[in-house]
């Protein structure tokens, strides 16, 4: 129900971003003003924008899995596109109504091409950074003092793991990397604090292998987890 209500907003937003992209590409090179090129790029854009819907409607298959992965990456990149374009348009709106020097150059065809290229570089940089951080386990160490008796224990080395998001994008290779880092910390106890699955359970490519990999976590007092 929520998806149906948000669908018109999503489509309008995608159309707005498409119009901005076409204007920028046209200012970069006249080849992007040709109808044939625009139609081809529009088909690709529609495929990306509707990949999440198409994947939902298709039966489970390798192609459906591919579309799910595409839609996951698309939604992540789309967020950066929206933020970058909105900030750029707000700055454009403000500068257009001020006595900004060289305003004519900024709002010329060449200026539009430069601004659009800067936006593209920002979007690509944040997208690559996001993909990298999602696929590489980050270890943060903290010392916490609890003002109560620990019985026979003076200290406890706890490893807290969160947001595994197993699914179409994160699988067994990532879990191998994570388990290796956990075991290197030599924990007394391991806690998995939710969001184990990103999509549905069926999104995991080989759940038996993932389970085998996770069973390799070594700790003195065991591993405790909550689904999310």
Show which residues each predicted segment covers.
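Non-catalytic terminal accessory segments
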Residues: 1-135
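Membrane-embedded segments
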Residues: 134-140, 145-228
């Amino acid at each position: 129900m929520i998806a149906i209500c948000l669908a018109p907003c999503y489509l309008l937003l995608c159309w707005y971003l498409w119009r901005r992209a076409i204007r920028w590409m046209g200012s970069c090179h006249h080849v992007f003003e040709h109808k044939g090129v625009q139609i081809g790029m529009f088909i690709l854009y529609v495929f990306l924008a509707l990949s999440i819907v198409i994947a939902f409607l298709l039966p489970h298959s390798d192609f459906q899995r591919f579309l799910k992965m595409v839609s996951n990456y698309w939604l992540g990149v789309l967020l950066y596109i929206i933020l970058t374009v909105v900030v750029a348009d707000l700055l454009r709106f403000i500068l257009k109504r001020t006595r900004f020097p060289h305003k004519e150059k900024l709002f010329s065809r060449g200026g539009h091409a430069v601004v659009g290229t800067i936006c593209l570089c920002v979007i690509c940089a944040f997208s690559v950074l996001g993909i990298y951080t999602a696929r590489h386990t980050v270890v943060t160490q903290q010392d916490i003092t609890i003002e109560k008796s620990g019985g026979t224990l003076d200290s406890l080395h706890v490893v807290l793991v969160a947001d595994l998001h197993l699914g179409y994008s994160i699988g067994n290779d990532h879990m191998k990397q994570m388990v290796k880092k956990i075991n290197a910390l030599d924990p007394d106890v391991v806690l998995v604090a939710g969001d184990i699955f990103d999509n549905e359970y069926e999104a995991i490519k080989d759940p038996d292998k993932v389970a085998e990999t996770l069973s390799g976590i070594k700790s003195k007092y065991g591993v405790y987890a909550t689904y999310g």
